[in-house]
């Protein structure tokens, strides 16, 4: 009789473990699906070549429209106001909800010495488009910086 009760308890315990496992898998799946909504840039690093257009993509997997701005910055630029040898195209654009768009940069080699030590970053900002009905509040601007590597001159 005691053995029968132990077997029933073991079976009940295993069922509870199974229910806990299924519940935790459901929670993880629910959490993962909510992480897929957002804004993103691809790739995570850009390899620029002299006078060539390098494309990257911006993604909007949300139900909001965003104004996207881009520029190339460097550590030296903030200190010395150095000239940035890049052109961005387009510098600003509207990114509709649940869409993606191609953007790009061009490295302009204007006879300057190629310096691999110089660090450049593509700074992309996502500004939520404000609705006319939104009288109060403020928008949160999301900014992401991506390393721009300079390839050897061709």
From Swiss-Prot:
It comes from the Bacteria. Keywords: Chaperone, Fimbrium biogenesis. The keyword Chaperone applies. The keyword Transport does not apply. Pfam families: PapD_N (PF00345). GO terms for cellular component: outer membrane-bounded periplasmic space. GO terms for biological process: cell wall organization. InterPro entries: Ig-like_fold, PapD-like_sf, Pili_assmbl_chaperone_N. Belongs to the periplasmic pilus chaperone family. Could be required for the biogenesis of a putative fimbria. This is Protein FasC.
